[in-house]
């Protein structure tokens, strides 16, 4: 029996708190909050949950923006900043770090492989 929540097959062998974290947009604290609201013990394995309890989890997860909706929201926020010409948008466009990190000697991950200077 595969448990499906928010379009994601969550692992049935794991505890409810851990299994919920397989959904994009749900971390540890939000998983605990969802379990508390659904009145489910976070240490209960997903395979031991009844269908009613799974429905309660689905309802609670449905209250949050997760998976595709969250990904779309984040990409639209980045696109909006780029269109506005905001500092963060410019940094996104140029593929540079956004949050004030130094780029003279580091930031190789963000900048990519070194490009040779052609003469």
Curated annotation (Swiss-Prot):
Gene Ontology CC terms, in alphabetical order: cytosol; small ribosomal subunit
Keyword Ribosomal protein assigned: yes
UniProt-listed GO biological process terms: translation
UniProt key word Thylakoid: no
Top-rank lineage group of the source organism: Bacteria
Coiled coil regions in record: none
Molecular functions per Gene Ontology: rRNA binding; structural constituent of ribosome; tRNA binding
Pfam families to which the protein is assigned, alphabetical: Ribosomal_S13
Keywords: Ribonucleoprotein, Ribosomal protein, RNA-binding, rRNA-binding, tRNA-binding
Region called Disordered, residue ranges: 93-119
Family: Belongs to the universal ribosomal protein uS13 family.
Function summary: Located at the top of the head of the 30S subunit, it contacts several helices of the 16S rRNA. In the 70S ribosome it contacts the 23S rRNA (bridge B1a) and protein L5 of the 50S subunit (bridge B1b), connecting the 2 subunits; these bridges are implicated in subunit movement. Contacts the tRNAs in the A and P-sites.
Subunit structure: Part of the 30S ribosomal subunit. Forms a loose heterodimer with protein S19. Forms two bridges to the 50S subunit in the 70S ribosome.
Full protein name: Small ribosomal subunit protein uS13
